Amino acid sequence: MASWEAQEELRELLHHLPEDDPPADLTHLLELDEMEPKVLCGENPGDEKLKKQVIKTPPMHPSTVTWHFGYKQKEDQQDNIKMRDWVPDPSKMSKSTCKRLILLGLYQACKAQEIIKMDYDVHWEKSVVNEQYFEVEYNCKMCRTVLHEPMPIMYDPETELWVKPGRLRGPLGSAVYTLKKHYERCLLTLPSLKGTRLPKRRCNPSRRYETFREHPPTRKRRSKEGIPTDQQPSTSNGDPMALLSGPCGPHSIQPPSCLLQELPKPEVGSPEMAVAMSGGPFWEEVYGDSIFATPLGSSEDQLLSQFD
């Protein structure tokens, strides 16, 4: 006995209609293959949407997308815009690579390595004082404190490197020591939950650099040998003996005991030596003890004094 599904299939076959038969002439299908695509363009409402789905643009690098949609349009609208975290060539470097190049331009490799290991958020933005300069700041991730870099940085398009504007690192100072002390202090305390701390008010790095460049500081520099150029005594009490020539001078390898040779020495058997050996004038007056006098005291003390 056939099942219920088999009976339904048999019933559908019995109710076959004439229009369900395939057409005898199939020449119109060959004409569809010979038609050009331009003929159908515009007739189908979803033709343009279908083309956009089929033709896909290649994916862009994230840094390129950020630069194009974040800075390219702003640069076209405003020429003197203050750019933040600007990447000169996104096709060759990312923000992380640009940050490392900036730190290598500001400091030596060992100092830049210390800053990267301390894991600060490094940001840079275009200066309003000079369009070529970029001001660098360091944001602490633990307490959100903003620390400023005293030296501005600039990008050289010819060499494609980040370089310092000039050689004024000494007068301007360094931020490595401040970053290290702040990082060590934050490790010992809990992060601040009261809100963002405002950055310390200080002079603009670009304006400060321009001031030092126009008016260089006139400070006395120490010579390479370690002797001041003005030949003033370098001792704490102002005694110029350390700068004199001789065995006790700064360039001598003899011990300081040579100074004792210049002091007066008491002669053996003199009253000064007797007073010094007996314990001083107070000891001699009170106890009558002296190396030239007869020892005082009991017989027991005299007996013990023979074995001294």
Swiss-Prot record:
Residues 228-304 are annotated as: Transactivation domain. A motif (Nuclear localization signal) lies at residues 217-226. GO terms for biological process: positive regulation of DNA-templated transcription; viral process. It comes from the Viruses. Residues 200-242 are annotated as: Disordered. Homodimer or homomultimer. Forms complexes with the host nuclear factors NFIA, NFIB, NFIC or NFIX. Transcriptional transactivator that activates the viral internal promoter (IP), thereby enhancing its own expression. This transactivation is repressed by nuclear factor I. Also transactivates the long terminal repeat (LTR) promoter, thereby inducing structural gene expression, initiating the late phase of infection. It is therefore a key regulator of viral gene expression. It directly binds to and activates DNA target sites of viral promoters and those of distinct cellular genes. Required for viral replication. This is Protein Bel-1. Residues 229-238 have a biased composition (Polar residues). It is found in: Host nucleus. GO terms for molecular function: DNA binding. It holds the Pfam family Foamy_BEL. Residues 94-203 bind DNA. It comes from Simian foamy virus type 1. One of its GO terms (cellular component) is host cell nucleus. Residues 207-217 have a biased composition (Basic and acidic residues). Keywords: Activator, DNA-binding, Host nucleus, Transcription, Transcription regulation.
